[in-house]
Design a protein with these regions (language model features):
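Conserved donor NDP-sugar-binding/catalytic core segment of glycosyltransferases
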Residues: 8-60
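A recurrent flexible, glycine/aromatic-enriched loop bordering the glycosyltransferase active site
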Residues: 56-95
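Non-catalytic, C-terminal membrane-associated alpha-helical segments of glycosyltransferases
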Residues: 152-164, 177-200
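Acidic donor-binding loop at a coil-to-helix junction in glycosyltransferase catalytic cores
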Residues: 92, 113-120
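Catalytic beta-strand/loop signature of glycosyltransferases that borders the donor
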Residues: 27, 110, 131-139
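The conserved acidic donor/metal-binding loop of glycosyltransferases
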Residues: 1-5
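Active-site donor/metal-binding and catalytic loop motifs
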Residues: 134-151
Length: 200
């Protein structure tokens, strides 16, 4: 997400914690609107925006959620293991294996803002790939902002799609990476950043 600031060990932690047959489910630490506007590029590059004392000095209140910034060792493991929060695919902080992503055909392009990442994770779960909670291991700050693109119609549409995905145990979307006319045909990845293309 473009409204998130990952800590410098974000990607390396995802790589370290990866497990076959699982996807990783992280979270974020949501900042107030005032603090979101106050953070500078230098605060990010220096890493001070991840320092709890610095953030408290900027007005962040005491909260259990601050453990996301400070937990280490056994405490981090315990918080990840026993959190009541379900391990879901969260667009701001999640990772999975390419083979699993292709197996469910990625995101459903019918969906707009509000739950499109969760629906993708629900299809992974239906496919047998279960989430692993790492919300206290991968630190990601979320900048608050207005959401003019959020509408009641889009939210309801997404809820209906998710309800069907869960109820019918849907694994594959026909409106994802590979469109219906290519399903069942060989697909290859030219490089990490290239689009998927049909093999000749």
């Amino acid at each position: 997400d473009g409204d998130c600031i990952p800590r410098k060990d974000f990607v390396s932690t995802h790589l370290c914690l990866r497990r076959k047959g699982r996807f990783l489910s992280g979270g974020y630490h949501k900042l107030s609107m005032d603090l979101s506007k106050d953070i500078t590029k230098d605060d990010i590059l220096s890493g001070r925006c991840f320092d709890l004392q610095w953030m408290r000095g900027k007005g962040m209140p005491a909260s259990f959620k601050n453990n996301k910034l400070t937990a280490t060792g056994f405490k981090r493991w315990a918080l990840n293991t026993f959190t009541p929060t379900k391990a879901s695919w969260n667009g701001h902080n999640a990772s999975g294996w390419l083979s699993d992503i292709l197996a469910v055909n990625g995101f459903d392009e019918r969906m707009q803002y509000g739950g499109q990442d969760r629906e993708f994770g629900e299809r992974l779960e239906n496919y047998g790939i279960h989430g692993m909670q790492i919300r206290y291991s991968t630190v990601c700050l979320h900048l608050d902002h207005a959401r003019g693109y959020k509408t009641k119609d889009s939210i309801q549409k997404n809820r209906n799609i998710r309800k069907h995905t869960r109820g019918a145990k849907v694994q594959w979307t026909s409106l994802g990476i590979v469109k219906d006319e290519l399903r069942g045909q060989s697909v290859k990845v030219n490089s990490y950043y290239d689009r998927y293309t049909r093999e000749e």
